[in-house]
Amino acid sequence: MPAAPRAASASPAAVAPGSDPVVSIDSLDMEARGVGRLVNEDGTPGKVIFVEGALPGETVSYKSFRRKPSYEQAHLLEVRRESVMRVKPGCKHFGVCGGCSMQHLDSRAQLAIKQRVLEDNLWHLSKVRPEVMFRPIAGPDWGYRYRARLTVRYVAKKGGVLVGFHERKSSYVADMTSCEILPPHISAMLVPLRELVTGLSIRDRMPQIELAVGHEVTALVLRILEPLTDADKDLLRAFADQHNVQFWLQPKGPDTVVPFYPLDRELAYTLPEFGIRMPFKPTDFTQVNHHINRVLIGRALRLLDVQPQDRLLDLFCGIGNFTLPLATQGRSVMGIEGSEALTTRALANAGYNGLAEKTEFACRNLFEVTAEDIAALGRFDRWLIDPPREGALAVCKALGELSQQGSDVLPQRIVYVSCSPATLARDAGLLVHEAGYRLAGAGVVNMFPHTSHVESIAVFERR
């Protein structure tokens, strides 16, 4: 029979029958939960305990809500010994709202933990270590989220509408009156939005509001399951005039999104360092954090070390977020994107910014690309890869095959921007172990402060 586990921070007699169990927290997992391990009576390692809200260095009591043979998931009851990294959360809804998971952790410690997550993934998944760890890219901790999807829920018992993020690990909508990670003007609009939707005839047929903040325009996309009445339209127009926003309507899928009022506005963000303005639709993919996006572009271009004669390739190019800045520095750039709508937008943005002659765009499924497809593109001096969470597996496999064939189309340098340390690690393993690259450097990009999301950037150099 296996020995019964006891708390790692206490002797067997220290935990009296019926009292709350105690554990020492050693680390955080990918969901920002504290991780500790119990010790069996015979001194052997026991179960791993995941405690929501606990921090490394703390001793906490907990209550388990899910028990498995090798681990337990638990709620935090009391902090017996507090970490020096613990701070007071900046939002009154923290702990209930699921939008943030790390507000109780000092911002510098957040960066250090994310950097460790990146390093651990690279080593444990692919046995790769960067030659240099870059200083984290960081910016303002509050008011940074310029894109968000808010859930709308009519609650008859409460006599009104809730507008906000989901509660933590729940389908319920948090009763939010403000949000510190949204821009201040959006945070101040949450209560008026609730009042607006409550007054609409379709208040129980509007499940979602998607917001996108541009340089001059704030767009609100209303997901409507029934047509608006004339009275509804009057309310929306009045609200738009009062709060200086633009309403868009989405009756069905994302392709059905159309502007409603006012119609004389253009949603766009700017990249002033490059003299670029990027018009976009509110449902297009754009980075949520404008400040970090600008810093990230600058670092990516410096790491690529673009020369005036270089021919450049931008994979998963979206609306041209990296493509157009690259075009201001290299001889020419080809952008490839899997979405036809985004490819069309990128082409239009190149023309809008006077860069059409230096850019070329194509719509391709990069998740199914082959070595033959890559070879057919010809040689580019430098690549930028910015895939979604799924990563760039097919692309990196193709590079490995081409390397083993002795092909001369492989670029000298690749900068890889990632929103998943696990898929970056997987792809880095292919580039290093099969395609003949070395991982010259990597670092985290704090695109989402106070969340466990880890964005990163890495540079690969051909050996």
From Swiss-Prot:
Its EC number is 2.1.1.190. It catalyses: uridine(1939) in 23S rRNA + S-adenosyl-L-methionine = 5-methyluridine(1939) in 23S rRNA + S-adenosyl-L-homocysteine + H(+). [4Fe-4S] cluster binds at residues 91, 97, 100, 179. The active site is at 419 (nucleophile). GO terms for biological process: rRNA base methylation. Residues 14-78 form the TRAM domain. Catalyzes the formation of 5-methyl-uridine at position 1939 (m5U1939) in 23S rRNA. Belongs to the class I-like SAM-binding methyltransferase superfamily. RNA M5U methyltransferase family. RlmD subfamily. This is 23S rRNA (uracil(1939)-C(5))-methyltransferase RlmD. It comes from Cupriavidus pinatubonensis (strain JMP 134 / LMG 1197).
